[in-house]
Amino acid sequence: MEKIKLGVICGGMSTENEVSVVSASYVLSNLNKEKYEIYPVYIDKNGQWWEILDEFKPRKFGEEITKKEKIKNEFKYLKNLDVIFPVLHGLYGEDGTIQGLFELLQIPYVGCHVLASSVGMDKVYAKVVFEKAGINQTKSVYVRKYNDKYVYIDEHFNEEILSDIDVAKKVQTRIDFPMFVKPSNSGSSVGVKKAENERELVEAINYAAQFDKKVLIEQGIIGREVECAVLGNEDVIASSVGEIKAADEFYSYDAKYNNQESRTEIPANLPKDIIEEIRKQAVKAFKAIDGSGLSRVDFFVENGTNKIYLNEINTLPGFTSISMYPKLFEQAGIKYEDLLDKLIELAL
């Protein structure tokens, strides 16, 4: 049987370049070499494309790709492929940008298409879609950086230009402390800070605005962080539910990738009806953005009430050894290698 020419793309120009490389190293190590002719590609932080010549082995976080060859004509290189697995996280890889390129070149690819990727990446507009779908979410406020000030945007999208201090005061009229402040277009908790008072809120808004001009401020929920993986196109299945036991105050970038004390619990120790509702809401969120292939959907379960709040959807979740997406399906009996086969099959 003729092998499928599979491109695996990693790296990218986002702040999640290193995470993407680690994810891709595990994908490359687990692909069936009898089934696929593999073309591994690295995009560096400047946007240059390289063919990876290193051996396929799991990499540590921050480990550089040493053997690579510059790709002179990216379009010609891509047109040679049967299907692409973009193991890219963050801007220019998970936001519909590269998916649009694949669409123009008419090459099948793993994962969500342009619209779903774009909406899933933009936390502000994802909230608009999820609200329309009737999915419970935390209260939130959206502001936009404008020169040395901010545009405060109310629930009807009316705008008002204010200083950072005045924006912080305005935010407090709509939501209470603690708050979580995050860039609208960012992943892996990059740029996220918790604010317990007005001073911390001002600092957090200015910090998040370094990563994206759109900043989302959310009401903090005292509860548990849980995640559910989904797989499919029209016929979508949901995994079991896993819980994040973060070493830090919340599941920050450092807690995800550097702090060994962070751990996961699969399946989460929750009542059966809560687990089933989370699985149902995960599929609903995926379909609300017109998702395809895969996503990981993150929720909070409030202490005391067990009320479920959708946190966000991740249309191209991590594939490292500690990543929840493959671990959730492994618990359901789908091995890593078989999961990759299924994702590629869905793309084709």
Stretches found by the model and what they are:
Residues 38, 108-109, 137, 179, ...:
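Hydrophobic beta-strand scaffold residues
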Residues 45-47, 145-147, 185-187, 221-224, ...:
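Glycine-rich beta-alpha junction loops
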Residues 219, 228-230, 286-319, 329:
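Conserved metal-phosphate-binding beta-hairpin within the catalytic cores
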Residues 1-115, 119-125, 144-162, 166:
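ATP-binding N-terminal substructure of ATP-dependent carboxylate-amine bond-forming enzymes
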Residues 90, 189, 244-247, 314-328:
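Glycine-rich phosphate/pyrophosphate-binding beta-alpha loops
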Residues 2-10, 14, 22, 78, ...:
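Active-site nucleotide/adenylate-binding loops and adjacent lid/helix of ATP-dependent enzymes
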Residues 193-280, 304-309:
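Phosphate-binding site of ATP-dependent enzymes
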